[in-house]
Curated annotation (Swiss-Prot):
The gene is SERPINI1. It comes from the Eukaryota. GO terms for molecular function: serine-type endopeptidase inhibitor activity. Glycans are attached at residues 157, 401. Keywords: Cytoplasmic vesicle, Glycoprotein, Protease inhibitor, Secreted, Serine protease inhibitor, Signal. Detected in embryonic ocular vitreous fluid (at protein level). In the embryo present in retina, brain, cerebellum and spinal cord. In adult, predominantly expressed in the brain. Serine protease inhibitor that inhibits plasminogen activators and plasmin but not thrombin. May be involved in the formation or reorganization of synaptic connections as well as for synaptic plasticity in the adult nervous system. May protect neurons from cell damage by tissue-type plasminogen activator. This is Neuroserpin. It comes from Gallus gallus (Chicken). Its main location: secreted. The keyword Secreted applies. The record marks 362-363 as: Reactive bond. GO terms for cellular component: cytoplasmic vesicle lumen; extracellular space; neuronal cell body; perikaryon.
Length: 410
C-alpha cells in the first residue's frame, strides 16, 4: 500500500513527545480540514495528509509575526501552548516520520527554495533546519520551466516516483520569492495480507444508487472491529468500524462504514476528534470477514480556500506579516496546494493481478462481515501516538486492473 502526501506553499512579494502537546490536536485539524473539503466536494473522493499540512504551515508560522502568527496558531490548535512549544512537537513528528522502521517506510522531506539574491533571515533558516530539517536552495524563479522541472524531480525522488508533475511553469514567475514544499511517503504491508486469488469483480453501489464494477479483496481473519450508534432510532443507525493493522502494528487503517441504505453524508457530521479516539479505544480484536475494494485515489487540492475557512486569512493578503522570515515587508502567501495518492491492494504494496478460483459466499455467516461495497470514510493513524497521517473518503473507487471472477452468489 502506498500513501503519499505533498503540500506546496508559494510566497510572493506584495504590499512520543517532549512537549505536553494536546493528544487530539492533529485529529482536530484533520476533522476541520475534512469538513471544509466535504462542504466543497459534495460527491467526490477526498484524500489529504493532515500531518503534511500541519508541518508545512508550521514552517510558515516560524516566519510569522503579529496577527498573521496568531491566526495560524489558533487555526492549528496551538493556543494552549506557550509560543514556540508547538515546533518541538512538530519536530518530534517529523523525526518519527523519518526514523527507519523495518516493518514499513514512512519518510518526510521538507524543502525551501529561495530566489537568487533574495534575503531570508538567517535565524529563520536556522530554525527551519533545526525543527524541520529542511533543504534550503537558491533558485531563479524567472526560469519557470526549469524551476518546475527541478522541483518536480525533487518531489518524485521523495515520493518514490509516485507523485509526478506536481507543479508547472505557470506556478512561478519573476515575482516568486520563496517556495516551501513538504512531502510525506508511506508504504506498508498489511499484517495479514489478502490473498490475490480471492479477489473477484464486485458491484460497488454509489450514493446515487448507480453501480460500478471493482475488484473486491477478501479474507477472514482477526481484526479490530466494533459497531457504533449514530444516535438515531432508525434501523440503519448502526455503523461499523474496522481497523486493519500494517506489519509492526504501529500503523493502521481504519474503515468507517454506514449501513448500505444510509448515505455516507449522513454519518460524516458525527466525525469528531473525540469520536476517532473513541473508535480506537472501543474496537475489539475478533474474527471478521472482510470484503475490501482494491482501488486507487489521487487528488490535488487547492488549500487556499480550505485554510481561509479555518481562519487563516491574513497570510494570504497584502497585510501579511512574515517579517520573521524576511525583512522584506511585502511578502504574502500566494498559493497553497496539496496532492496525495492512495493505493490499496492485497499485499498493502503493489501486487500482481489476481486470477484465482476460490468462490466466496455470504452463506452460513459465523462472524461479523464488513462488506465495503458502498461509500466509506477512512483514516490512517499511528496507533501509539494517535497521530492521523491520512484521512479521506471513497465515493467513486478507481479500480485497478484485475482478472478476477464475479461473485456468483452475491
Amino acid at each position: 500500500m502506498y500513501f503519499l502526501g505533498l503540500l506546496s506553499l508559494l510566497v510572493l512579494p506584495s504590499k512520543a513527545f517532549k512537549t505536553n502537546f494536546p493528544d487530539e490536536t492533529i485529529a482536530e485539524l484533520s476533522v476541520n480540514v475534512y469538513n471544509q473539503l466535504r462542504a466543497a466536494r459534495e460527491d467526490e473522493n477526498i484524500l489529504f495528509c493532515p500531518l503534511s499540512i500541519a508541518i508545512a504551515m508550521g514552517m510558515i508560522e516560524l516566519g510569522a509575526h503579529g496577527t498573521t502568527l496568531k491566526e495560524i496558531r489558533h487555526s492549528l490548535g496551538f493556543d494552549s501552548l506557550k509560543n514556540g512549544e508547538e515546533f518541538t512537537f512538530l519536530k518530534d513528528l517529523s523525526d518519527m516520520a523519518t526514523t527507519e522502521e523495518s516493518h514499513y517506510v514512512l519518510n518526510m522531506a521538507n524543502s525551501l527554495y529561495v530566489q537568487n539574491g533574495f534575503h531570508v533571515s538567517e535565524k529563520f533558516l536556522q530554525l527551519v533546519k533545526k525543527y524541520f530539517k529542511a533543504e534550503v536552495e537558491n533558485i531563479d524563479f524567472s526560469q519557470s520551466a526549469a524551476v518546475a522541472t527541478h522541483i518536480n524531480k525533487w518531489v518524485e525522488n521523495h515520493t518514490n516516483n509516485m507523485i509526478k508533475d506536481f507543479v508547472s511553469s505557470r506556478d512561478f514567475s519573476a515575482l516568486t520569492h520563496l517556495v516551501l514544499i513538504n512531502a510525506i511517503y508511506f508504504k506498508g504491508n498489511w499484517k495479514s495480507q489478502f490473498r490475490p486469488e480471492n479477489t473477484r469483480t464486485f458491484s460497488f453501489t454509489k450514493d446515487d444508487e448507480t453501480e460500478v464494477q471493482i475488484p473486491m479483496m477478501y479474507q477472514q481473519g482477526e481484526f479490530y472491529y466494533g459497531e457504533f450508534s449514530d444516535g438515531s432510532n432508525e434501523a440503519g443507525g448502526i455503523y461499523q468500524v474496522l481497523e486493519i493493522p500494517y506489519e509492526g502494528d504501529e500503523i493502521s487503517m481504519m474503515i468507517v462504514l454506514s449501513r448500505q441504505e444510509v448515505p455516507l453524508v449522513t454519518l460524516e457530521p458525527l466525525v469528531k476528534a473525540s469520536l476517532i479516539n473513541e473508535w480506537a479505544n472501543s474496537v475489539k480484536k475478533q474474527k471478521v470477514e472482510v470484503y475490501l475494494p482494491r482501488f486507487t485515489v489521487e487528488q490535488e487540492i487547492d488549500l487556499k480556500d480550505v485554510l481561509k475557512g479555518l481562519g487563516i486569512t491574513e497570510v494570504f493578503s497584502r497585510s501579511a506579516d512574515l517579517t520573521a522570515m524576511s525583512d522584506n515587508k511585502e511578502l504574502y502567501l500566494a498559493k497553497a496546494f496539496h496532492k496525495a495518492f492512495l493505493e490499496v491492494n492485497e499485499e498493502g504494496s503493489e501486487a500482481a493481478a489476481a486470477s484465482g478460483m476460490i468462490a466466496i459466499s455470504r452463506m452460513a455467516v459465523l462472524y461479523p462481515q464488513v462488506i465495503v461495497d458502498h461509500p466509506f470514510f477512512f483514516l490512517v493513524r499511528n496507533r501509539r501516538t494517535g497521530t492521523v497521517l491520512f484521512m479521506g473518503r471513497v465515493m467513486h473507487p478507481e479500480a485497478m486492473n484485475t482478472s478476477g471472477h464475479d461473485f456468483e452468489e452475491l
